[in-house]
């Protein structure tokens, strides 16, 4: 249980309704301020570098008005699992009867492990940024090993999850994606793999050129991993 006097404002903004972010469910999205990666293509720089404006207490008050109107709450960002009180907050939201989805870069495996052990989450979207040789360049971080730990945790957990990769054609090509698919296959992953197209024209952390969608012309799916494309802009 959160104590009111110690609650800061970790949430940058709130999307009150979506049918796109939790498979087959209605949801709202909580956008957490701050991130421990600086992905070159990130088009949420205001969230990554910005400060929160909404407290957990205010968010819970809002969610209580959405009981029986929404199925789920999506925790996104930024990186939602960075915040010290995220586990207690997720527990409070879960008690309201909502399904819980976590969008994460996988950098906090210990937090993810505790959430799994406490049975607080229902669905996870795990960002697979790149293979180790490109990971630091793309994310400006050295967090591949924590990501890998998170992936293995999810594989062992039985929780429904998806793996997704944002692609900018200047940073990731067909060979890179094929290596990533091979890596996922070697871990035992057999789910869907979503390739998210970079949104051209959006403000980003690093200035990048136009991203082309050449990958859509390729049949990248394997016997065990089906590749889907998101973003038709």
Which residues fall in each region the model found?
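A secondary-structure boundary/capping signal
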Residues: 31, 76-77
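Generic beta-structure capping elements
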Residues: 14, 33, 45, 129-131, ...
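Flexible, glycine- and charge-enriched loops at secondary-structure boundaries
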Residues: 49-56, 140-144, 213
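Auxiliary Fe-S-binding modules of radical SAM enzymes
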Residues: 1-20, 24, 171-233
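Short, well-ordered turn and helix-capping elements at secondary-structure junctions
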Residues: 15-18, 46, 77-79, 106, ...
